[in-house]
Amino acid sequence: MGSPSGPGALAKESSTILNQVMITDPAEDIDRENERQLEAAVGLTPVTGLGLVGDDGVDDGGRGGLRSRHDYSNTAGRRKETTFGSYILGQTLGEGEFGKVKLGWKKDGSIQVAIKLIRRESLGSNPSRLPKIYREISILRDLSHPNIVRLHEMVETDRHIGIIMEYASGGELFDYILNNRYLKDNAARRLFAQLVSGVGYLHKKGIVHRDLKLENLLLDRNRNIIITDFGFANTFHATDELGEEIEFNLTNREFVKRMRLDKTDSHGLRRGDLMQTSCGSPCYAAPELVVSDSLYTGRKVDVWSCGVILVSLLLP
């Protein structure tokens, strides 16, 4: 997308920047895209269409002319242009509880990004919401993997908190499958390998995602996976392995209390990857998140979600 043109100055999204932190250069996204493509190219389905099987049972080469649900939300006609920090704001890519994700680009039109705009007023008086946002930013800034979204910048204004990230031009994997029914085995294997690579990287770094689903798996222009939306992500002690006895007795409240498994350390973490907050999306959630409020192991929750995603890739 090129830089928009028109008479007059650009309208500012907000007049006061309170804080601005640069993490990575958005220009690096081109190199990251090439890296993903090189890793995906070895002995697997070419990227021209992901080997998708359409209604006629053959590879339709991509979306088959269909539009995503985001496409329908784009309004015709020209809107007043606004800026956020050093970026021009474009169309809405998605919406959440606290704000929107907008397409953005540098004022010279050279670099596209995704900007998660969180309205300060939407946070209300709940004291846990703002730390959760800062935790997401803290987790993202320490990640560097070709199949995990890259954080570029954090900008705080008097009205919004903006998280500027790598833009995935291929949209959601959910939309891709919705429009094409299912994938051929080779294409599904390639995408699932990328997902597992990213999740394995997170777990080695002591991070669980806790909301893995098709809607949070984006595609770059070459149809390679980018894991995104770390709003429910949390950290854990990666080197503290729990024994089978502990994992087997997590629903036994007396055992949990006796072993002090419900206690947290000075960083707010329990033993190993034990967690208690129920979160994520019901269709992808592990049973222990749905049937009880007991402690659970975070990594296994991610593994379960990966299994659901694999089934979704293969079943019509």
Where are each of the predicted segments found?
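Activation-segment/catalytic-loop signature of the eukaryotic protein kinase fold
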Residues: 154
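Protein kinase glycine-rich loop
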Residues: 89-97, 101
